[in-house]
């Protein structure tokens, strides 16, 4: 008997919603990346986009552990000479919390065409509302919350 290999048409994609309130950012990112890759399914294969859609709400209430709010910087470059910009994690969390959560999750996905396809199934919202109620997302509970 040969090993079962899933085909692209055999995979079904369900929807999950994760509430990021008081959840440590790294632990949230690991769980979301595993859902996006499909590693929670018994039919996981690294060459198939078998992951699910993930909707994250309340990104503005995510917990950052340690002294990272003031002590850790986030960098980006404009592409011009002298164009390196830096902000602390606290400043980024105040301005665009959805981008901070999205960058943490996308950084845990493969850096290939397949990884970009997986990251397109990630939807992050700063507040408690999202426009994906028609897809009937299933709540996904993360057991460990910040103290």
Curated annotation (Swiss-Prot):
Record's function text: This protein is one of the early assembly proteins of the 50S ribosomal subunit, although it is not seen to bind rRNA by itself. It is important during the early stages of 50S assembly.
Pfam families named in the record: Ribosomal_L13 (PF00572)
Record-linked SUPFAM superfamilies: Ribosomal protein L13 (SSF52161)
UniProtKB keywords: Ribonucleoprotein, Ribosomal protein
The keyword Methyltransferase is assigned to this record: no
Family matches, as CDD domains: Ribosomal_L13 (cd00392)
PROSITE patterns, per database record: RIBOSOMAL_L13 (PS00783)
GO biological process, one term: translation
GO cellular component, one term: cytosolic large ribosomal subunit
One annotated GO molecular function: structural constituent of ribosome
Subunit structure: Part of the 50S ribosomal subunit.
Name listed for the protein in its UniProt record: Large ribosomal subunit protein uL13
Assigned protein family: Belongs to the universal ribosomal protein uL13 family.
């Amino acid at each position: 008997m040969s090993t079962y290999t899933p085909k692209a048409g055999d995979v079904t994609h369900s929807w999950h919603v994760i509430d990021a309130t008081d959840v440590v950012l790294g632990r949230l990112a690991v769980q979301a990346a595993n859902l996006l890759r499909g590693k929670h399914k018994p039919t996981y294969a690294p060459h198939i986009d078998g992951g699910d859609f993930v909707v994250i709400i309340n990104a503005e209430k995510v917990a950052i552990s340690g002294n990272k709010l003031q002590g850790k910087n986030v960098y980006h470059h404009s592409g011009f000479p002298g164009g390196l910009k830096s902000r602390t994690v606290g400043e980024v969390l105040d301005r665009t919390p959805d981008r901070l959560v999205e960058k943490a999750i996308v950084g845990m996905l493969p850096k290939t065409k397949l990884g970009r396809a997986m990251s397109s199934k990630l939807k992050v919202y700063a507040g408690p509302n999202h426009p994906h109620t028609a897809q009937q997302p299933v709540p996904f509970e993360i057991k460990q919350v910040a103290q």
